[in-house]
Amino acid sequence: MKQESRTNINRVKKDISSPDSFTPPEELKRQLITTMQSIYDEEDIEAVERAYKVAYKAHEKQKRKSGEPYIIHPICVAIILAELELDKETIMAGLLHDVVEDTETTHEDIVRDFGEEVAQLVDGVTKLGQLSYSKDKIEVQAENLRKMFLAMAKDIRVILIKLADRLHNMRTMQFMRPEKQKEKSRETMDIYAPIAHRLGISKIKVELDDLALRYLKPDVYEDLERSLDSAKEEREAFIQEIVDEVKGHIDHAGIKAEIDGRVKHMFSIYKKMVNQHKTIDQIYDLFAVRIKVDTVKDCYAALGIIHEMYKPIPGRFKDYIAMPKPNMYQSLHTTLIGPEGHPFEIQIRTFEMHRVAEYGIAAHWKYKENNNTKGLNKEEEKLSWLREVLEWQRDMDDNKEFLSLLKTNLDLFAEQVYCFTPNGDVKNLANGSTPIDFAYSIHSAVGNKMVGARVNGRQVPFDYHLQNGDRVEIITSQNSKGPSRDWLGIVKSAQARSKINQWFKRQFKEENIVRGKELLEKYCKSKSIRLPELMKPEYIKKVELKYLSLIHISEPTRLLSI
């Protein structure tokens, strides 16, 4: 058997191309056609060109916020869909996805020119519309998600177009206001990236996460980028040593394989730093070596070779081939001790598993040159989680209950914690939130009178970190003297911190009012005047104040010198 092994070292780059925002439309169109030429037949390319001409004419007078021609956006969306190797109807719908909503073109026009299938895809994207997501509005969030899952059920390609649309919008966010950048990035990280993950499309998911991190935590992103660049040679030398050793042993065993090493994505590194409470310099498993082989048998054979070469870390082996993830992902994962005691991860999978890992559900809509049959066929059972969601939607009228179940079972919102009040209301809090955060999310009066908390019927300390599904009961007392300043070092949310600070400011203000009133009464007695007489112009002019309450609070001593 001929031994064949290819190796690559690369920093994480955009796998799906990111054309320059100001590239002329005609040049982008050529890029789209070039992308299609290797796998699509001439008839399909001609159909896409017809869709381009209609989209170009419809958007001819429109501009984006950047000032560039609007048509650039749908072309870039179509390029992303073509790189996912989706069918021509999806690519055509990508080009046309904004024409019904933003131009005079009608649904009937699309049906007449391109057929019912393309028109339905465009209609699906139009109806899905702009998500109005806010982390404090559970009802709105749940309704948006219901809408998205129903669209998925009708035709999964609608969501694929929407993901491509969001990806290009995230790539060109530099022209938006900072507050809009953060809003869109939070929406992306909380909704779009998790859905891309649930559909198994890692090529889109990882880029969405990285782009969202860039705008949500720009300082963190820049620090990570600098750190990775500064130690690039050292890290690449480390991973190259691993790749070369693995290549030699795999070749010797006669296994045909493609081997590459890569630095993990920014968001993945950031999560690792947060979860492990480490700096980037303290983390060495920033790398993953990937081995791609022809058969499942070769996967396990390669695993045996690797475990003979390096000492595996107990508890860090995962067999996702025997037990695939719900999003169709399959691979063998093992973490090992490498040179100088530094840990690193190896992933082993077949070439087909790799295609599914990169493209997810899109891999099963892949254009087939000799087969125009579309659909998921035998792969439909791998979307059982979507059918389960649809069953929940039918059975649940309560949006809060639906969202809670969705979070618990599908892990769509990993960065937030969803807890219940004793009455069953859902509270969404930042990961790491405490019972104090929970109390202030209900009302400031509840937080200010809080003296304890029970979680799932058990008394917990104030610094307990709430978990998904916790039922939280806040214990209050009218005899409470108010919050402690120590709470400011415990709470997670800015809302709770602000309300605690407001309480202390108010207390200081009330104490000043009492003290000021005492001084004013003493002053009035010494001058043989009544308190209301202080509002006469001669007194107000002397102290340069207009309101008696302000005299009470801030200027009581100034009157003593009159």
What are the residue ranges of the model-derived segments?
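Short hydrophobic/aromatic beta-strand micro-patches
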Residues: K292-D294
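Alpha-helical phosphate/pyrophosphate-handling elements in metalloenzyme active cores
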Residues: R50, E60-G94, E101-D109
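Terpene synthase/cyclase
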Residues: M1-I16, S21-F22, E104-T106, E116, ...
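Alpha-helical scaffolds flanking conserved acidic
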Residues: I72, D87-L96, E117, L121, ...
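Internal insertion modules embedded within essential enzymes
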Residues: P24-L28, H107, G115-V118, G124-V289, ...
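N- or domain-start disorder-to-order transition segments that initiate the globular core
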Residues: I39, A58, D136-E139
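Short, contiguous pre-domain boundary segments
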Residues: I9-D41
